[in-house]
Amino acid sequence: MSVKWEKQEGNEGVLTVEVDAETFKTALDDAFKKVVKQVSIPGFRKGKIPRGLFEQRFGVEALYQDALDILLPVEYPKAVEEAGIEPVDRPEIDVEKIEKGESLIFTAKVTVKPEVKLGEYKGLGIEKDDTTVTDEDVQNELKALQERQAELVVKEEGAVEEGNTVVLDFEGFVDGEAFEGGKAENYSLEVGSGSFIPGFEDQLVGLEAGAEKDVEVTFPEEYHAEDLAGKPAVFKVKIHEIKAKELPELDDEFAKDIDEEVETLAELTEKTKKRLEEAKENEADAKLREELVLKASENAEIDVPQAMVDTELDRMLKEFEQRLQMQGMNLELYTQFSGQDEAALKEQMKEDAEKRVKSNLTLEAIAKAENLEVSDEEVDAELTKMAEAYNMPVENIKQAIGSTDAMKEDLKVRKAIDFLVENR
């Protein structure tokens, strides 16, 4: 095999590959063995046609495509490795020369990983956020726990206040006409939650049970239903019931109800403080790492290939779809509800995708510049961690992953981030 790499504009180039005649002959032989099983000629059993007769009847050209299908998946990766390039998209293959008894020549037009010119990445001067947890933070968290344990109790008298839950009927009208989806009966709404159109909930404050009112609002310009967006509407509302939150006492009994591992409010308070400290620490760490990576990538010069951005966009869209599925929704329903098609979603994600790609390329370059390597022991430790997380034997994890090359690259990128943190 002979290989020639010609760099073209940007990150594109052409790989010219010559496969020796003997290797091409072997591929033709294998192609014949496959094709002959599907061909019938009078006087011969299927699969038993002599090679010479086959080529006389159909021509050797009938074997070329199958030979290429056998050859290219083997020879193209070899050529890539020999040329020392890292393609980031599928190659555009053109066969330049194909003839029985001769060498095969093909070209592959590909986009490769770009060169990274690193800027400053040490001493970036980014500090970690303060992770101090105050008594006020702890009390606010305990208050939130109280809120979550609150019971809704019917108010026998008094008017609607912020935070109350009202049970109401409503019907909406635009230009005097009722519209689809604008009517409900015995609907529970927490006033101040922002669940309804801006201005709707505010106008319920001060009403008493049994009250009726015309609530005048305007649909937001960006409202998902285009036929209602930006239009004024009137909702005829009737209040049936008003409920107020009744908070449990903040005492030892409350503490035991919240956490069976504690006996007193003091223990719950201490445990809450430690949990908040850990959460703040993790949040500050994540923010620091994100800011360092962003700054280092902003300082680097990289011509990011569109092919890499497109691949990242596809990955991000799949991640988004998985999150939707966890919420009981799918991408099709989301696009119908939001009025955005897949192309519009990708356009929204494009800037983040470009940042992700540039950040990853920068981290790979830092790992190379600083000679950061990943040992087999570190890979084994990561496999063990995954096995524990999924409650599976390590061998099963290894079989599922196959090659650990991608894991090594991921660990190397993590080491690059650790390096930024240590040398900030």
Curated annotation (Swiss-Prot):
Any single Gene Ontology cellular-component annotation: cytoplasm
Matching Gene3D superfamilies? 3.10.50.40, Trigger factor ribosome-binding domain (3.30.70.1050), Trigger factor, C-terminal domain (1.10.3120.10)
Indicate where this protein resides in the cell: Cytoplasm
Question: What EC number(s) is this enzyme filed under?
Answer: 5.2.1.8
MF terms from GO for this chain are:
peptidyl-prolyl cis-trans isomerase activity; protein folding chaperone; ribosome binding
Question: Which reactions is this enzyme annotated as catalysing?
Answer: [protein]-peptidylproline (omega=180) = [protein]-peptidylproline (omega=0)
Task: Give the superkingdom in one word.
Answer: Bacteria
Q: Which UniProt keywords apply?
A: Cell cycle, Cell division, Chaperone, Cytoplasm, Isomerase, Rotamase
Q: Which residues form the PPIase FKBP-type domain?
A: 163-248
GO biological process, alphabetically ordered: 'de novo' cotranslational protein folding; cell division; chaperone-mediated protein folding; protein transport; protein unfolding
- Read off the Pfam families from this record: FKBP_C, Trigger_C, Trigger_N
Family designation: Belongs to the FKBP-type PPIase family. Tig subfamily.
Please give the function described in this protein's UniProt entry: Involved in protein export. Acts as a chaperone by maintaining the newly synthesized protein in an open conformation. Functions as a peptidyl-prolyl cis-trans isomerase.
Question: What's said on domains?
Answer: Consists of 3 domains; the N-terminus binds the ribosome, the middle domain has PPIase activity, while the C-terminus has intrinsic chaperone activity on its own.
- What HAMAP family does the record point to? Trigger_factor_Tig (MF_00303)
Record-given protein name: Trigger factor
Instruction: Give the gene that encodes this protein.
Output: tig
